């Protein structure tokens, strides 16, 4: 089997070599993740590490932690807050035992999951903007607002896609830019509980629904983790979606 193709000037992987490299990296990552989780399990006082995006699902997270702490035999849950899109990596590499992820933005491939909460999205605007007087908007109304571009978040490799919007790394930075009239943002409707004076939200009729899920490695046999997932599923809530073609009622 040939893994490399060599010439006088170049060395390139064959298809077999590319597969071996990809699978080898995955195997090494899995070993490293297993080592981290094994070391945590061997500690004198067992515990769980739960990772969540900073500024997201805070109310749900608080309810989950309080409900689990009241369970007989509950262990300590360390909360690891991270930037957007980082939860998946921290769960895969073993630095976390369980994660709160958000479909369709986070990949849940390879994880066991349970749905916890489904909600619509809103546009966050600086207070006083003309569109804040509208009862509802559509994505076409907000994707190219003059002077209020949507933000650009970093990819998993830390780089930003080209575009007119400001580069942001966290919600605090984003909300300040919106307050200053430099950006707008489409976010889950639960963001309303975190907004300060100077910001207003308007529901979006046709924005994709966001589903918060609790995710964990499929091979886990941890009883504390199973108990945490059981408690989490008991908190499941669902907001009925607004039909994309629905028009706002006079009472809204």
Give the residues covered by each predicted segment:
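C-terminal regulatory
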Residues: 106, 110-182, 191-209, 238-252
């Amino acid at each position: 089997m040939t893994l490399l193709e060599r010439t006088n000037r170049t060395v390139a992987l064959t298809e077999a070599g590319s597969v071996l490299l990809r699978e080898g990296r995955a195997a090494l990552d899995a070993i490293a993740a297993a080592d981290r989780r094994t070391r945590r399990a061997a500690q004198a006082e067992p515990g769980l590490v739960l990772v969540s995006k900073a500024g997201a699902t805070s109310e749900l997270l608080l309810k989950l932690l309080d409900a689990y702490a009241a369970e007989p035999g509950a262990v300590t849950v360390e909360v690891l807050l991270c930037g957007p899109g980082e939860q998946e990596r921290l769960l895969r590499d073993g630095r976390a035992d369980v994660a709160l992820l958000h479909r369709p933005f986070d990949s849940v491939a390879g994880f066991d999951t349970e749905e916890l909460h489904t909600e619509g999205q809103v546009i966050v605007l600086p207070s006083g903007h003309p569109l804040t007087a509208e009862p509802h908007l559509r994505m076409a109304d907000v994707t190219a607002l003059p002077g209020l571009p949507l933000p650009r978040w970093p990819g998993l490799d830390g780089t930003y896609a080209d575009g007119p919007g400001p580069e942001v790394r966290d919600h605090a930075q984003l909300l300040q830019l919106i307050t200053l009239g430099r950006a707008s943002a489409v976010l889950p409707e639960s963001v309303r509980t975190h907004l300060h004076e100077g910001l207003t939200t308007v529901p979006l009729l046709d924005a994709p629904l966001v589903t918060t899920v609790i995710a964990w490695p499929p091979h886990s046999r941890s009883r504390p983790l199973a108990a945490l997932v059981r408690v989490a599923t008991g908190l499941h809530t669902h907001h009925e979606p607004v039909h994309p073609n629905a028009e706002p009622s006079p009472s809204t």
